[in-house]
Amino acid sequence: MAEECNKLLEFPSVVDRYFKRWYKSDVKGKPCEDHCILQHSNRICIITLAECHPLLQNGKTIKTISYQISANCSRLQNKVSGKSKRGAQFLTEHAPLCRISSTDGEEYTIYSCIRGRLLEVNENILQNPELLKEKPSTEGYIAVVLPKFEESKTVTEGLLSQQEYEEILLSRAAVGSGTVSAV
């Protein structure tokens, strides 16, 4: 009985309990630049970096994060109001959300990966970029996007489920170790 009380119970995290993970691998043809989309049952999607993104690997240090996409477009200028989210910027699958540079000179562009309205960007990562590395699925998210109601069921077409993504990671590891097996 005492052993049962002392036994640690494994509960799923809040993210795993309320969100379904979807992945986009090799975004824009760039190897290993994977994004994760957390989809809630209420349609809201949170864009994050996938665990295997190069920024989260190899001890990289983040130098700057910029939501300034072009001279006329800053994601920080997104002002949303009202029930129908008036004023929200509309995003396509290939719309850039932010640019992140590391101290080794690499620059990564993070894309929306889904169509919808930009509800908010995470301004906390501007002051504390390490949140991206320390808590990529929670406090280190990139942006919150709301797909159109009529597209909410099809928004994940072209994205990978967690199981499909894990299979891709295994195949990358096999290629990296030189032990590719015939399918």
UniProtKB/Swiss-Prot annotation:
Function: May regulate actin polymerization, filopodia dynamics and arborization of neurons.
Classification via InterPro entries: Abitram (IPR039169), GCV_H/Fam206 (IPR033753), Single_hybrid_motif (IPR011053)
Principal location: nucleus
Species this protein is from: Xenopus tropicalis
Taxonomic superkingdom: Eukaryota
Presence of the UniProt keyword Nucleus in the record: yes
Location relative to the cell: Nucleus speckle; Cell projection, Lamellipodium; Nucleus; Cell projection, Growth cone
Protein name, per record: Protein Abitram
Biological-process GO terms, alphabetical: dendrite morphogenesis; regulation of actin filament polymerization; regulation of filopodium assembly
Disulfide bonds: none
Family: Belongs to the ABITRAM family.
UniProt entry keywords in alphabetical sequence: Cell projection, Nucleus
GO CC terms: dendrite; filopodium tip; growth cone; lamellipodium; nuclear speck
